Amino acid sequence: MSAKKLTGNEIRKKFLSFYAQREHTILPSASLVPEDPTVLLTIAGMLPFKPIFLGQQPRQYPRATTSQKCIRTNDIENVGRTARHHTFFEMLGNFSFGDYFKPEAIALAWELSTKIFALPPERLVVSVFREDDEAFAIWRDQIGIPAHRIQRMDEADNFWASGPTGPCGPCSEIYYDFHPELGDDHIDLEDDTRFIEFYNLVFMQYNRDANGNLTPLENRNIDTGMGLERMAQILQKVPNNYETDLIFPIIKTASDIADIDYRKSDDKTKVSLKVIGDHVRAVANLIADGVTASNVGRGYILRRLIRRVVRHGRLIGISGEFTSKVAETAITLAEDIYPNLRERETVIKAELQREESRFLETLERGEKLLAEIMAKPETKKTQHISGEDAFKLYDTYGFPLELTQEIAEENGLTVDVSMFDQEMKLAQIRSQSAHETIDLTAQDGVKLDIDKTQFLGYTDLSSPAQVMALVGDGEQLETVQAGAQVQIVLDKTPFYAESGGQIADRGYLSGDSLVVRIEDVQKQNNIFVHFGRIERGRLQLGMTVNAQIDGTCRRRAQANHTATHLLQAALRSLVDSSISQAGSLVSFDRLRFDFNCPRGLKPEEVEQVEAQVNSWIAEAHSATVAEMPLEVAKAKGAVAMFGEKYADVVRVVDYPGVSMELCGGTHVNNTAEIGVFKIISEAGISSGVRRIEAVAGLAVLDYLKVRDAVVKELSDRFKAKPEELSERVSNLQQELKDSQKQLEALKGELAVAKSDQLLGNAETVGEFQILVAEMPGVDAEALKTAAERLQQKLDESAVVLGSAAEGKVSLVAAFSKSVNGKGLQAGKFIGGIAKICGGGGGGRPNLAQAGGRDPSKLKEALESAKEQLVDGLK
């Protein structure tokens, strides 16, 4: 019997169907961004079920089966170098929650492997935990595997635990033997050239206490995992996971862009292609699941993966941007099982292009400096890059330590990581010492043992309240006199504490001859701390005061907060349904809304969004506010802030048919109370994050007053009526544009004149004319015009021109088709030459442009170009 050759999609489908037919509920893959706060990413198929295994959540079904997307980066350096290491992989799994156990799990796994996937039994070897006699007996007596093909393994290999204490149990693994001809005399499962582990069965049957004692669990569970990529390698009979149909099409796209043949490539090139194939799957799925590149957490993992893709692309000769092209292949391969890939295609490609463009600039600077560091005599002597140099690359140029280590390793060098860490700590200390910090919390040197504050502000603007604590200068106080600043805790309060982007209420505390102005309110552990100044009288611990918020400020904040909700709803409706909030500020005079979006909004889109918000305001939608379980709120479609952790019971602010969000802020009862809404600006603030600033309600009048003053000043300056200003500015812009065109035309004519003088410098090489020359002070566009003209005049020829101006280098190559026929492509040729000047570029086979950052290297670059042309055209 021989194994059936199946596609990756067929393997996944057969696995899930097999278990579905055996009463398992098929569940969709969970997001790569887990709900478990202890891990950054979903690293295993069982992670979504961890709360059930740990007894923290009740089971909803006795059996389940999934194809779970996972990411692990702990051994990223092995990706592409071994046959089966990956960052992104799919784990096929079947799970039992207190239902079937060891005998059934083993029998099902064997039936699936030998009947459905038709793996020859004589090619399978299994492992068990050394003390698991029960599993050994099941494999031998019930399944019929010879005892010598059942390997007993140590705890490190075949015993699973969720931590030092808690549920745990032995494992059993199934291995495929690629070389049965070697016989069974010496079976070494660590020989990964012969054996591949493709199915792991975890039998959770014990609870481990703090003393290490094991006691049987009342409800025993099964957790299994089959690597989809590994099973594909086995069934498709390819030498490694990368050459399966799950990954190889991505590799093929990358190799086509690089114009190389994977099959004929050397090992180093194949490693780079495999890294690209693996990492592109990872980054596409991460972005699809809402991760954006950053310098912290999972955002840093994404950024690191993208940068590795870019760098390995350069290693195989790709000089321009390419990541979005290979991502398209990754999306096409997996969109049927993970539809959010196609839904978020625009976001994925935009994020890749943005990160790639930025990193290419970083690479150009960093690689040049790193090359200089590696060329230093002391580096060559010690075969070691100092921590100081590595940190300078990181701190000054944004060059990642991991990348420095990779390049160093490729050149036979090491990096002093411990010294790098010391430099990092020193930098942090320097940064901290450059700032003074003031702790404004009531717990500054004071431990307050009091009950949480009762918040009344959703319904009441004033309320009597008892003073529970007074804090000043780091001490608890009993009495505070007029003129003093103090932090006050009340038993209940109508004051909204700053949270969720909304600033705190302002107002007063009052009593007999007492007035306390409240300037801020902060909240810690549900204790509201009022920051106030005693304007008159004396405030005492335990006294009763009247807490009164400023109604005008509250109404302004409410209008701006509700307008923020309407703004998000309009953006999701009119621009992109995947838009999510990245931050906000709701104050009395304005609002600011930050949101994840891969592109800037068009002017007409801004107008449409503003019009939609004003339309909803005019329609007078009433608010419905309710508390409900989080899952119920999500099921109703309530919008939550991505990455935010919510309590089991949440507050939902709903303007039916318009906006429904999880929110603890204060809002208008009816949208008509807002009055009017005006967008002031829309701009990018960081990679993939946009910001809209706007005003609502009475704040719009303040904004219009300022704008009218500006218009009046411009009218006076241009001596024009306000309605004539646009035409007057347009005329000035057109005059400037015409002048610039005339200047460019003159530059072009000058370049042509100069180029005609160079014709006599052309040299004959075989049947071709070659001309390599510098044209000082000529810009890139004029240089291109000159190169094309010279190539046409010289006919069968190769022309390379260079120019240095304003600290930059411009290079152009123009080749005739006959030169292309000799294997010389202008795009690749000029890209290689530009590297000498610390730059890069590319283009078509017959015409290409490049740039560089080091004018001092231009002469060397042109000399190299001439030598290469002579050698290539002989």
From Swiss-Prot:
<keyword id="KW-0963">Cytoplasm</keyword>
<dbReference type="Pfam" id="PF01411">
    <property type="entry name" value="tRNA-synt_2c"/>
</dbReference>
<keyword id="KW-0436">Ligase</keyword>
<dbReference type="InterPro" id="IPR018164">
    <property type="entry name" value="Ala-tRNA-synth_IIc_N"/>
</dbReference>
<feature type="binding site">
    <location>
        <position position="565"/>
    </location>
    <ligand>
        <name>Zn(2+)</name>
    </ligand>
</feature>
<protein>
    <recommendedName>
        <fullName>Alanine--tRNA ligase</fullName>
        <ecNumber>6.1.1.7</ecNumber>
    </recommendedName>
</protein>
<dbReference type="InterPro" id="IPR003156">
    <property type="entry name" value="DHHA1_dom"/>
</dbReference>
<dbReference type="InterPro" id="IPR045864">
    <property type="entry name" value="aa-tRNA-synth_II/BPL/LPL"/>
</dbReference>
<comment type="similarity">
    <text>Belongs to the class-II aminoacyl-tRNA synthetase family.</text>
</comment>
<feature type="binding site">
    <location>
        <position position="663"/>
    </location>
    <ligand>
        <name>Zn(2+)</name>
    </ligand>
</feature>
<keyword id="KW-0820">tRNA-binding</keyword>
<dbReference type="GO" id="GO:0006419">
    <property type="term" value="P:alanyl-tRNA aminoacylation"/>
</dbReference>
<dbReference type="InterPro" id="IPR018163">
    <property type="entry name" value="Thr/Ala-tRNA-synth_IIc_edit"/>
</dbReference>
<dbReference type="Pfam" id="PF07973">
    <property type="entry name" value="tRNA_SAD"/>
</dbReference>
<feature type="binding site">
    <location>
        <position position="667"/>
    </location>
    <ligand>
        <name>Zn(2+)</name>
    </ligand>
</feature>
<comment type="function">
    <text>Catalyzes the attachment of alanine to tRNA(Ala) in a two-step reaction: alanine is first activated by ATP to form Ala-AMP and then transferred to the acceptor end of tRNA(Ala). Also edits incorrectly charged Ser-tRNA(Ala) and Gly-tRNA(Ala) via its editing domain.</text>
</comment>
<dbReference type="GO" id="GO:0002161">
    <property type="term" value="F:aminoacyl-tRNA deacylase activity"/>
</dbReference>
<keyword id="KW-0030">Aminoacyl-tRNA synthetase</keyword>
<dbReference type="GO" id="GO:0008270">
    <property type="term" value="F:zinc ion binding"/>
</dbReference>
<dbReference type="InterPro" id="IPR018162">
    <property type="entry name" value="Ala-tRNA-ligase_IIc_anticod-bd"/>
</dbReference>
<dbReference type="InterPro" id="IPR018165">
    <property type="entry name" value="Ala-tRNA-synth_IIc_core"/>
</dbReference>
<keyword id="KW-0547">Nucleotide-binding</keyword>
<keyword id="KW-0479">Metal-binding</keyword>
<keyword id="KW-0648">Protein biosynthesis</keyword>
<dbReference type="GO" id="GO:0004813">
    <property type="term" value="F:alanine-tRNA ligase activity"/>
</dbReference>
<dbReference type="GO" id="GO:0000049">
    <property type="term" value="F:tRNA binding"/>
</dbReference>
<dbReference type="InterPro" id="IPR050058">
    <property type="entry name" value="Ala-tRNA_ligase"/>
</dbReference>
<dbReference type="GO" id="GO:0005829">
    <property type="term" value="C:cytosol"/>
</dbReference>
<dbReference type="InterPro" id="IPR023033">
    <property type="entry name" value="Ala_tRNA_ligase_euk/bac"/>
</dbReference>
<dbReference type="Pfam" id="PF02272">
    <property type="entry name" value="DHHA1"/>
</dbReference>
<dbReference type="GO" id="GO:0005524">
    <property type="term" value="F:ATP binding"/>
</dbReference>
<dbReference type="InterPro" id="IPR009000">
    <property type="entry name" value="Transl_B-barrel_sf"/>
</dbReference>
<keyword id="KW-0862">Zinc</keyword>
<keyword id="KW-0694">RNA-binding</keyword>
<feature type="binding site">
    <location>
        <position position="561"/>
    </location>
    <ligand>
        <name>Zn(2+)</name>
    </ligand>
</feature>
<dbReference type="InterPro" id="IPR012947">
    <property type="entry name" value="tRNA_SAD"/>
</dbReference>
<keyword id="KW-0067">ATP-binding</keyword>
<dbReference type="InterPro" id="IPR002318">
    <property type="entry name" value="Ala-tRNA-lgiase_IIc"/>
</dbReference>
